[in-house]
Amino acid sequence: MTAVGTDGLDAIRTDPSRAVLGFDFDGTLAPIVDDPAAARAHPGAAPALARLAPRVGTLAIITGRPARVAVEYGGFEGVDGLVVLGQYGLERWESGALTEPDPPPGIAEARAKLPGVLEAAGAPPGTFVEDKTHAIVVHTRRCAEPQVALDRLRSIIEALAERTGLAVEPGRYVLELRPPGVDKGRALRSLADAFAAKHGAPPSAVLFAGDDLGDLAAFDAVDALRAEGVPGVTVCSASNEVTELAERADLVVDGPAGIVELLGTLAAADSAPE
């Protein structure tokens, strides 16, 4: 645990009712699986979130998935007080209500062109596409050599993104096409700013937990808030596939099981993580 991370956890423990806590879904609250549609939250995640939600100022899941999908796969429908920001913050689910914009035109164009692009490039067997409505994802996890396949496809996906006005976000054997200027850092910052606007003061602390490259933007947001005087904590749900987050994080835990343990500790009034 880093010194600044310890300060952040102490601030959460001292004044949890003004803390803003954000968690990624896949790889953080839910184990990574070969089929995205088969992903489900760790069985302890929803109960732990339900215990924590009444104690903190804002409790949110920030995910690249559609918000309703994360709610369904996580079993979060009955977690009072939980906010789910889907599609990197484009969608907001709260108390059963979903707010979402129309998909940008570039997504429809990319959706139409991507099958032909992959075929022309000779995409390796096992390559598949996930349609998130506001984003399109190319997966290589099922390929015989996932990283080789990902590297082979990277340049053609980047070229398609440029033609359609989209951005490419790499991840754990994925390349995601999504609108530019949308990321988990902006989503986390929006939660902190909304809290400050509502309460007339910044949060007592901010925490974000993630596992993949797309979560680094949220780590950057925590760092920016620290620079403004808000204690912060960055948490890595560790895997053997991505090391960058562990190198940046204040606290590294053992995958979704470790995240659930952290949630339970945060929910306990008389203790904080070591």
Task: Please identify what each model-predicted range represents.
Residues T2-A3, P16, H42, G185-E274:
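Mg2+-dependent phosphoryl-transfer enzymes with acidic/Ser/Thr/Gly-rich catalytic loops
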Residues A19-L21, L82, V206:
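The start of beta-strands in P-loop NTPase/AAA+ ATPase cores
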Residues M1-F25, L29-V33, G44, R51, ...:
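Non-catalytic pre-domain segments flanking phosphatase-related domains
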Residues F76-E91, A159, L245-E261:
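Structural recognition of alpha->loop->beta junctions
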Residues A121-A209, L213-A221, E228-V230:
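Conserved acidic, metal-coordinating active-site core of Asp-based
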Residues R40-K132:
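Active-site phosphate-binding/coordination module
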Residues T28, A67, G214:
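Conserved Rossmann-like nucleotide-cofactor binding loop
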